[in-house]
UniProtKB/Swiss-Prot annotation:
One of its GO terms (biological process) is epoxygenase P450 pathway. Heme binds at residue 439. This is Cytochrome P450 2A7. Cytochromes P450 are a group of heme-thiolate monooxygenases. In liver microsomes, this enzyme is involved in an NADPH-dependent electron transport pathway. It oxidizes a variety of structurally unrelated compounds, including steroids, fatty acids, and xenobiotics. InterPro entries: Cyt_P450, Cyt_P450_CS, Cyt_P450_E_grp-I, Cyt_P450_E_grp-I_CYP2A-like, Cyt_P450_sf, Cytochrome_P450_fam2. It is found in: Endoplasmic reticulum membrane; Microsome membrane. GO terms for molecular function: arachidonate epoxygenase activity; heme binding; iron ion binding; oxidoreductase activity, acting on paired donors, with incorporation or reduction of molecular oxygen, reduced flavin or flavoprotein as one donor, and incorporation of one atom of oxygen; oxygen binding. One of its GO terms (cellular component) is endoplasmic reticulum membrane. Keywords: Endoplasmic reticulum, Heme, Iron, Membrane, Metal-binding, Microsome, Monooxygenase, Oxidoreductase. Its cofactor is heme.
């Protein structure tokens, strides 16, 4: 009995010492790192966070500590940037220092620092330069990709017409369409909409994004070193990631067998050719692992973000039928009903442009951006960030900055219209991030959003099974990604 009592006292004493040391270390660095709540050993600020609403939970600290503060997500120390000014100062004014890539534990399980999106240093530089050039070679930013999107829009319209106005879940109708655009670039061809393997891949991607946006997904972000060895939903997420990697490996093997060095058919071919050209370069980053991970980067990013934005957009238009009516009026006046929309039409369609921008602003699909990391010891404002410090630029806080958007919690296309009804840009429109590690697929995504939205709205009216006042447009999850609520709808021919 005495021994157990002494053991308990010893444990309490050790815990007290650890807490006091944590407080001392925090105060010692206060003159350097931004301020923030005092962390506990290992668990950090976990007890002060609501993992169901992690973004809002993190943002609340700004009320006490200001727009730049430090939190501890378990053992991870992260500097958080809130609001337009802080985010722009870091990502644009000090772009080079803040251009490192931070941790994204779920995706890091498969990427492990390889591939264009999650790499750092010379690897990131080489792969990014190649990816941008290769996408351009396959038509991105040119008329070629616009024709590809228009063709895919036609397939989408046919698929929707085949529902004959029935109540449907639009999720996979939209993700099939969007994914086929990037698939035509990275794999050289589109998938049939009924292809079972294709539908399985889309389901895997959706499942991964949904996991990262759950409470368990956020726990994994904090305690991945422990949780990756334990049973739980994270193991299912790993299986989904492995399934996607296996699919990419199969595609790469096929291209290796059929490769014509003089006639690349897709992104994989182009990378394989570059691997051959660089095989004697000891510093090359062009090898099989980076090929597979870069291809997987493009496939996932080119599918989920745009399709989620479309899904959120149709829900918002059903919630606001007066906006849908104005969209229809502008389409009929500028394009009519007898020709396909073109990307250049957007210059004559300020209201449609404003609606799409407001959908992106309100939807806020990647609210915390991908984590950044400072590449060297960095002075930021009055603070000192040691080399390697992780940084969360809270894009959602910029998209809802009241200095730029009146009533930022409301969906209102007027946020992007001037007094004359003309489209107006905003420095706080940052859904693709800004600076050196912004989304290099931004141009493709903008074109897809305009052409897909406009083509669907040209052909259909949207009908919900609920009255507009009963439609809930609050997100299902807001963590790594913003996931809209599940819903069904009807597309009625116009």
């Amino acid at each position: 009995m005495l021994a157990s009592g002494l053991l308990l006292v010893a444990l309490l004493a050790c815990l007290t010492v650890m807490v006091l040391m944590s407080v001392w270390q925090q105060r010692k660095s206060r003159g350097k790192l931004p301020p923030g709540p005092t962390p506990l050993p290992f668990i950090g600020n976990y007890l002060q966070l609501n993992t169901e609403h992690i973004c809002d939970s993190i943002m609340k600290f700004s009320e006490c500590y200001g727009p730049v503060f430090t939190i501890h997500l378990g053992p991870r120390r992260v500097v958080v940037l809130c609001g337009h000014d802080a985010v722009r100062e870091a990502l644009v004014d000090q772009a080079e220092e803040f251009s490192g890539r931070g941790e994204q534990a779920t995706f890091d399980w498969v990427f492990k620092g390889y591939g264009v999106a999650f790499s750092n240093g010379e690897r990131a530089k080489q792969l990014l330069r190649f990816a941008i050039a290769t996408l351009r070679d396959f038509g991105v930013g040119k008329r070629g990709i616009e024709e590809r999107i228009q063709e895919e829009s036609g397939f989408l319209i046919e698929a929707i017409r085949s529902t004959h106005g029935a109540n449907i879940d639009p999720t996979f109708f939209l993700s099939r369409t969007v994914s086929n655009v990037i698939s035509s670039i990275v794999f050289g061809d589109r998938f049939d909409y009924e292809d079972k393997e294709f539908l399985s891949l889309l389901s895997m991607m959706l499942g991964i994004f949904q996991f990262t946006s759950t409470s368990t997904g956020q726990l994994y972000e904090m305690f991945s070193s422990v949780m990756k060895h334990l049973p739980g939903p994270q193991q299912q997420a790993f299986k989904l990631l492995q399934g996607l990697e296996d699919f990419i490996a199969k595609k790469v093997e096929h291209n290796q067998r059929t490769l014509d060095p003089n006639s690349p058919q897709d992104f994989i071919d182009s990378f394989l050719i570059h691997m051959q050209e660089e095989e004697k370069n000891p510093n090359t980053e062009f090898y099989l692992k980076n090929l597979m991970m870069s291809t997987l980067n493009l496939f996932i990013a080119g599918t989920e973000t745009v399709s989620t934005t479309l899904r959120y957009g149709f829900l918002l238009l059903m919630k606001h039928p007066e906006v849908e009516a104005k969209v229809h009026e502008e389409i009929d006046r500028v394009i009519g009903k007898n020709r396909q929309p073109k990307f250049e039409d957007r210059t004559k369609m300020p209201y449609m442009e404003a609606v799409i921008h407001e959908i992106q602003r309100f939807g806020d699909v990647i609210p915390m951006s991908l984590a950044r990391r400072v590449k060297k010891d960095t002075k930021f404002r009055d603070f000192f960030l040691p080399k390697g410090t992780e940084v969360f630029p809270m894009l959602g806080s910029v998209l809802r900055d009241p200095s730029f958007f009146s009533n930022p919690q409301d969906f209102n296309p007027q946020h992007f219209l001037d007094d004359k009804g003309q489209f107006k840009k905003s420095d706080a429109f940052v859904p693709f991030s800004i600076g050196k590690r912004n989304c290099f697929g931004e141009g493709l995504a903008r074109m897809e959003l305009f052409l897909f939205f406009t083509t669907v709205m040209q052909n259909f009216r949207l009908k919900s099974s609920q009255s507009p006042k009963d439609i809930d447009v609050s997100p299902k999850h807001v963590v790594f990604a913003t996931i809209p609520r599940n819903y069904t709808m009807s597309f009625l021919p116009r």
